[in-house]
Design a protein with these regions (language model features):
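Subset of outer-membrane beta-barrel
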Residues: 22-316
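Bacterial N-terminal signal peptides that target proteins for export
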Residues: 1-7
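N-terminal signal peptide c-region/cleavage motif recognized by signal peptidases
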Residues: 15-16
Length: 316
């Protein structure tokens, strides 16, 4: 089996999800997808959502400092036809100021048609990506937390596989009294240690900064995140994701957001001009009880279909 034919088939299948130039130059782009349904709902990019939410281990390792002890979390995301994204995490306190967590993520692309250079069918092959991580976070002061995640990443395409090591570094400043949360994250530092064949490829490094602001004496909270701050080949607006929450008491929220990059990447030209067909827009809601939490988010990450994200967390 020729890896060239296999990779071409996979690229053609996944191309609508990776329209940007930076995606086409990196591997393991499933790491760019949101895991948190709440993050998905407020624009698909967020690193400053400082809540008791175990899914933030996938977005900013510093934020597990605010997660309840012994919290287990299960997640599911629909993607394009035949593909699924599942993940899980567990958070444990380790003293008054430190926390640790473990996480795992699987993107299964299902069975994909393989063809020759002359479009002759050679049957089907499977492809999947897996990331397994360990996280440590520490409260440096009463308002500042830092965290690190070390990830082992593997990808299999038919009979070929690759391995990589990735590091996430995060910091968060949280002022509860004034409703401010500010964060900075460097995601996916590292690289491949085993290539599919002979050529090593880059993993999707992303430098991000973000802010969340709760309007005091109001149910409104706003979010803004700047991503891919080392790539300025694209317009400034494409680096921005924004969102807002309506907090209905202490336990329920409604959320909406907009991601300018997704809207432009997945815009489709038609007779009336260019239309994103809902790409960029996201919605969601969640409920938090004493031990049980349920979050649901909706957004578009592939031109062929929208995605539904479901998070379930339980504190033991």
């Amino acid at each position: 089996m020729n890896i060239r034919n296999v990779v071409i088939a996979l690229i053609l299948t996944l191309a609508p999800a990776s329209i940007g130039a930076q995606e086409s130059e990196t591997v393991y782009n499933f790491l760019r997808l949101p895991v948190s349904a709440h993050v998905a709902a407020i624009g698909g990019e967020n690193i400053s959502l400082a809540e008791d939410d175990a899914t933030m281990i996938f977005h900013n390792p510093a934020l597990i400092s605010g997660v309840s002890d012994k919290t287990i979390n299960l997640n599911y995301m629909t993607y394009m036809e035949g593909a699924k994204n599942v993940s899980a995490s567990f958070i444990k306190l380790a003293g008054e100021r430190s926390s640790w967590g473990v996480s795992a993520q699987l993107m299964d692309y299902g069975r994909i048609n393989q063809t020759t250079d002359y479009n002759e069918s050679l049957g089907k092959f499977s492809a999947r990506d897996i990331a397994i991580g360990g996280t440590f976070a520490y409260e440096l002061t009463d308002r500042i937390s830092g965290g690190i995640t070390a990830k082992f990443i593997t990808s299999t395409i038919a009979d070929y596989n690759s391995l990589a090591i990735g590091i996430d570094l995060g910091i968060n400043y949280l002022d509860i009294d004034r409703g401010w949360s500010l964060s900075a994250v460097a995601r996916n530092l590292g690289g491949q240690i085993k290539a599919y064949e002979d050529e090593f490829e880059r993993i999707p490094f992303d430098l991000q900064v973000g802010v969340s602001k709760r309007l005091m004496n109001s149910p409104l909270r706003f979010h803004a995140t700047l991503s891919r701050l080392t790539d300025w080949d694209e317009a400034f607006g494409r680096h921005i994701a924004i969102g807002a929450d309506v907090l209905l008491g202490e336990n329920i929220y409604l959320a909406a957001g907009y991601n300018f990059r997704k809207a432009q990447q997945m815009s489709i030209s038609d007779n009336d001009g260019s239309s994103a067909h809902g790409a960029g827009l996201s919605l969601g809601a969640g409920i938090s009880l004493q031990r049980f939490k349920l979050h649901i988010g909706w957004g578009k990450y592939h031109v062929s279909t929208s995605s539904l994200l479901i998070n379930i967390s339980y504190t033991l």
